[in-house]
Amino acid sequence: MSADIVDIGHTGWMPSVQSLSILLVPGALVLVILYLCERQCNDLMGAPPPGPWGLPFLGYLPFLDARAPHKSLQKLAKRYGGIFELKMGRVPTVVLSDAALVRDFFRRDVMTGRAPLYLTHGIMGGFGIICAQEDIWRHARRETIDWLKALGMTRRPGELRARLERRIARGVDECVRLFDTEAKKSCASEVNPLPALHHSLGNIINDLVFGITYKRDDPDWLYLQRLQEEGVKLIGVSGVVNFLPWLRHLPANVRNIRFLLEGKAKTHAIYDRIVEACGQRLKEKQKVFKELQEQKRLQRQLEKEQLRQSKEADPSQEQSEADEDDEESDEEDTYEPECILEHFLAVRDTDSQLYCDDQLRHLLADLFGAGVDTSLATLRWFLLYLAREQRCQRRLHELLLPLGPSPTLEELEPLAYLRACISETMRIRSVVPLGIPHGCKENFVVGDYFIKGGSMIVCSEWAIHMDPVAFPEPEEFRPERFLTADGAYQAPPQFIPFSSGYRMCPGEEMARMILTLFTGRILRRFHLELPSGTEVDMAGESGITLTPTPHMLRFTKLPAVEMRHAPDGAVVQD
């Protein structure tokens, strides 16, 4: 037997106390040195935010609920406060669960980077708007906002906004008709609201982004809807690959990633056909527009010549104001594109990466997905909660029944209670519960904390909106949280459904218009109920968005004529 090794038969060996000392002392010295270096760094630059320990290489990932990661982070927020840090794999992640901190962080340019996510950014390649950064992101965001405003996304009343409202209303009215048709087919008037909502809302976004709409049975449209529904779930299921890329080799993840990549390729092929057709339409429209402008120019020249000849024949004629404005009237208007794709093609510089084919394809996908995913999930939650909360629905009917069967934004927007119901839906079920992750572009000190460059910054909207201090009994659906004592709408400062800062949703106002028209017109035409004996799991399904589990609703049609309420509360037909 050696002095250093204890022989335990043929089963192995154990180091002696002396050997362990030789190994442990240098290791302890290394740990002490690392600790002192960290303390020195913290003294100079600030300490990192507090947070839980994780496992080597895995970080805190094993302790997150894969089905509801937003709830796991909510529990940590209760322990550590409005800001804490953990490791997602090897990615340092700062989680914000206080609205004031979110606004403070996201107003800074250093926080406008993209999060270091392997899967989503690998698929997107740094193009589009959601996963882009620096020049590509800035240009895409600026142009997108300008184009949306040109389509009518403004709070200012006028023809431009009215034109956008009419385009949205066509899709809303189609949805109402589909609900009516499906309810008549069912003996109990029970309808799955998802297909009608997805088709009609999707076609609104198709019209605004691509300048086209689809029939319900169009093969391309059916495929795009299926891809969107499955893709939103799969990216959530495979999300751990973002932090542990080697997991992409597991069979389940191989299948998921293959589905996403094949879906991307097929989607881009469909988009290429749409772009080509739109380009041809744009050329034809511009040609017709130029011909009309030329006719107007020739007509003005003819009128000028006739006026000149008339003056020569009668010099005593006085010069009119129209004569003075002749030069101004000769200025030709330019053709105004009718969708985002037309705007892109009209200003495209084919030599710039900002307008390359990859950027166009990914931008179109981002705008379509962002336009549909969040609004669709919000509408589904809204209808489900109103079917559960009959008190709230009755109050809405009292406000909506005196209006015509298709109320306008001008009629709906003053209804503070309707807006409060929409806001309460977005609070109680944040459809993007962890927001869109940001990336910290460089080392950054805020307050007493040091944020390492390359960190992922997460806005925990779920924790913010479910904070019992800001929203007592947060699981209770109470639209009154958004009303003042005199009934006016007022959003609490902790309410941030569209995030904040430079990367906040660029289509916020358009989303409000869409949600207001859908909710107002659907509730004006139908009474909603859950089928008898039905229980719906209100926890929802987590992916990129938080969506309701599949469910049916009972749609009972309300009178199309305007109704008023008698003093005793009875409904009276006008």
UniProtKB/Swiss-Prot annotation:
Catalytic activity as recorded in UniProt: 2,22,25-trideoxyecdysone + 2 reduced [adrenodoxin] + O2 + 2 H(+) = 2,22-dideoxyecdysone + 2 oxidized [adrenodoxin] + H2O
Recorded metabolic or biological pathway in which this protein acts: Steroid biosynthesis; ecdysteroid biosynthesis
Residues that coordinate or bind heme: 505
Domain of life of the organism encoding this protein: Eukaryota
Cited Pfam families: p450
Region Disordered: start-end pairs: 303-333
EC number: 1.14.15.-
Any GO MF annotation of the entry: ecdysteroid 25-hydroxylase activity
UniProt entry keywords in alphabetical sequence: Endoplasmic reticulum, Heme, Iron, Membrane, Metal-binding, Microsome, Monooxygenase, Oxidoreductase
Bias (Acidic residues): 320-333
Note: Member of the Halloween gene group.
Reported function: Involved in the metabolism of insect hormones; responsible for ecdysteroid C25-hydroxylase activity. May be involved in the breakdown of synthetic insecticides.
Protein name: Cytochrome P450 306a1
Gene: phtm
